[in-house]
Amino acid sequence: MAMAIDGYECTVCGDCEPVCPTGSIVFRDDHYAIEADSCNECTDVGEPRCLGVCPVDLCIQPLDD
């Protein structure tokens, strides 16, 4: 499973990018996105780190299959 950023909710603050241990959060086309193929939902710490720093509720959610 992977996480996804809602482009409508994202304020483009950039807080999530530096905390991603896999480098899965990228800035392209004027918004942040999570590359699903490399996102592991930070399984080593129990919760995605991006969720802990994002100031917007429901901006980052599990990716729908």
From Swiss-Prot:
- Sites where the protein binds [4Fe-4S] cluster 1: C10, C13, C16, C54
Please indicate which superkingdom the organism of origin belongs to: Bacteria
Q: Which GO terms describe its molecular function?
A: 4 iron, 4 sulfur cluster binding; metal ion binding
Q: Which UniProt keywords apply?
A: 4Fe-4S, Electron transport, Iron, Iron-sulfur, Metal-binding, Nitrogen fixation, Repeat, Transport
Q: Which cysteines are joined by disulfide bonds?
A: none
InterPro entries per record: 4Fe4S_Fe-S-bd, 4Fe4S_Fe_S_CS
**What's the short name of a Pfam family annotated to this entry?**
Fer4_7
Which cofactor is recorded for it?
[4Fe-4S] cluster
Q: Name one GO biological process term.
A: nitrogen fixation
Binding-site positions, [4Fe-4S] cluster 2: C20, C39, C42, C50
Cofactor info, note text = Binds 2 [4Fe-4S] clusters.
Q: What is this protein called?
A: Ferredoxin-like protein in vnf region
Q: Which organism's genome codes for this protein?
A: Azotobacter vinelandii
